[in-house]
Amino acid sequence: MHITGTHINYYQICHRKLWLFANSIQMEHTSDLVYEGRLIHETSYSRRSEKYTELELDGIKIDYFDTKNKMIHEVKKSNKREDAHLWQLKYYIYVLERNGMTGVSGILEYPKLRAREEVLLSSIDREELSAMQNEINRIIQSENAPEKISRSKCRNCSYFDFCWIGEMEETE
């Protein structure tokens, strides 16, 4: 199984979400937040698709790649910066490097914040990503889903109902 940017992102956020997604229990199609993210992606930079290339390689899909400058542009709908976004973009750079493309960098863009962050990949990042891949494989190949965690982020997660519906009924 190819590890995708989504796997890296979910690994940073919640191992249970990672396991559910990797084991074909996908709830994103019912999420208003995912839909909102797609809208922002499609409308924030409407002319961008003409200028950049979409790239699919080893299970990753990069929507905006500037081939001339070897720059990945990753757009996030969030109103705050998150490590999960950073590691997802670093993973894209890592995969391109593994496939012989050198000198790649990235930019994380947050239209809601009107902010951009340049992203580079260090040798320490490469080691960390290699370790993450091993840990992700261990998690997703496990017989059972990891235990749910209680975080404020859970409420906005597309898997919220899947994880918490029983507890919601008990407390009401």
Language-model segments: which ranges?
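Generic secondary-structure transition motif, activating predominantly at the C-termini of alpha-helices
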Residues: 12, 23-27, 133, 137-140, ...
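Metal-dependent nuclease catalytic cores that hydrolyze phosphodiester bonds in DNA/RNA
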Residues: 1-72, 76-83, 87, 168-172
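Cysteine-cluster motifs in flexible loop/terminal segments that predominantly coordinate metals
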Residues: 8, 14, 18, 144-172
